[in-house]
A protein has these predicted regions:
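Short helix/loop segment immediately N-terminal to the Walker
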Residues: 17-25, 142
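Rossmann-like S-adenosyl-L-methionine
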Residues: 55-215
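Non-catalytic surface loops within mature trypsin-like serine protease
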Residues: 35, 48-50, 77-79
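Extended interfacial segments that mediate partner engagement and assembly in macromolecular machines
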Residues: 1-20, 33, 38, 53
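Short, aliphatic-rich beta-strand segments
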Residues: 33, 40-49, 107-111, 211
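Short flexible coil/turn linkers enriched for glycine and charged/polar residues
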Residues: 37-40, 69
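RNA-binding accessory domains that recognize and position tRNA/RNA substrates
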Residues: 29
């Protein structure tokens, strides 16, 4: 709340107009803040209708001075007249462009457009119970459908022979691949595809799996 409040103040100081949904005029559309529950890392995503932020460097400097706890700042461009919050193009204004957090003993990279569970404490319980009920013995071929940044598949990989993770969001797949490398996991493969289509293709090819996780 404090970060958003101060961004509002900076918009006035820098005379940056906010976006009007009805008219389509204005530059500043949204602010998205993501926080690592365990790491405490903070990502601020500024969503603009144009890639040009007036006095960009000074704006970022002023925001960082007010909130030195911010880990990274990303500029996202959404020039479409749409209810969708995020656009396709992004520029990293400060930091790495992503944050990291811990889940079930593994480290995960989270970028602005990647899905991550909003309640990590409950997520650990949920994933633990799902893996327990799956009864993995180390011999199974597992599908992680709609895998996002790879969380459940990477966590389950310790108890499976092979994990096939499928996700349509290409940004999330990039994070998932990085997460596998970050955690030294080599028995997981990632596919950038619709999970339903992918599983039909597997079936048509005569392939099968022992367990499917669907979140």
């Amino acid at each position: 709340d404090a970060i958003i409040r101060d961004i509002r103040g900076l918009l006035k100081s820098f005379k940056i107009k906010t976006y009007n949904e009805d008219t389509g005029y204005g530059l500043f559309r949204h602010v998205l803040i993501r926080t690592g529950y365990h790491s405490g890392q903070i990502m601020v995503v500024l969503v603009l209708g144009s890639p040009i932020l007036p006095s960009k460097n000074n704006f970022v400097k002023a925001l960082r001075k007010l909130h030195p706890e911010i880990t990274t700042i990303v500029l996202n461009v959404n020039g479409q007249k749409t209810s969708m919050i995020l656009g396709e193009k992004e520029t990293v204004l400060y930091g790495k462009g992503y944050i990291e957090d811990e889940l079930c003993g593994k480290t995960f990279r989270i970028s602005s457009k990647s899905f991550y569970q909003v309640n990590p404490v409950q997520t650990e319980k949920l994933y633990g119970k799902a893996i327990e009920l799956a009864g993995l013995t180390g011999k199974e071929r597992v599908i992680d459908a709609y895998c996002g940044i790879g969380t459940i598949g990477l966590i389950a990989s310790d108890k499976a022979k092979e994990v096939i993770s499928v996700e349509l969001n290409s940004d999330a797949v990039r994070d998932a691949i990085a997460n596998a490398k970050r955690n030294g996991i080599k028995n997981v493969r990632f596919y950038n595809n619709d999970a339903g289509v992918f599983m039909h293709q597997m079936a048509d090819a005569g392939e099968s799996a022992d367990v499917v996780f669907m979140d």
